[in-house]
Amino acid sequence: MFKPFALVLLILAVSQLQATEPIKLPVPAEWRVENTSYPPPWAQTLPWKGTIQLRFPKSFFDSDSDYFWSYPILYQLRGDVITNTKELKRALLEYDAGLYGNKYPKENIKITLRTRPADQRYPMIIDDGFDPFTTNKQPRTSIVYHRRYEKQTDTTTILLLRSSQPYDPENDVWKTLRTLFRSHAGF
């Protein structure tokens, strides 16, 4: 009787340890990695704490590439946070405005939540922002938003799949972003 009970306890302990392990996004060949604390240095006014992971394809800065401004961002934040539209818009606006520096006025950034979700499930966001790195123009990016709160670890996990390509589930860029990163983040 003792052995089955001990086995159950061991399984529970191991599964609890696995649940507390932070998620690590994969790094495809030739993609650039950025892992940092949250809020990032350019958006210190944001109140939430945790980490972010970004993965950039080799052609991220090539305005002629389909992968221009196409990348995932994984947030792992402490607490049940960014729970509503107002907080989500604030997080995106402060992040983008800080990223653009003084090159583009914050009030010109437009963030719109679409009424029709991506893949009939995930909220879609349209971000009319700015490219401070390559073109100094205002590309429109589509963002597929994934969020969950894990009570056991008191962690909010958010995955943003972002691209300058209009969202189309048959588009190769969107297929790549979904295939490489969605399941690794647990969505």
Give the role of each language-model region.
Residues 84-106:
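Short, solvent-exposed recognition patches
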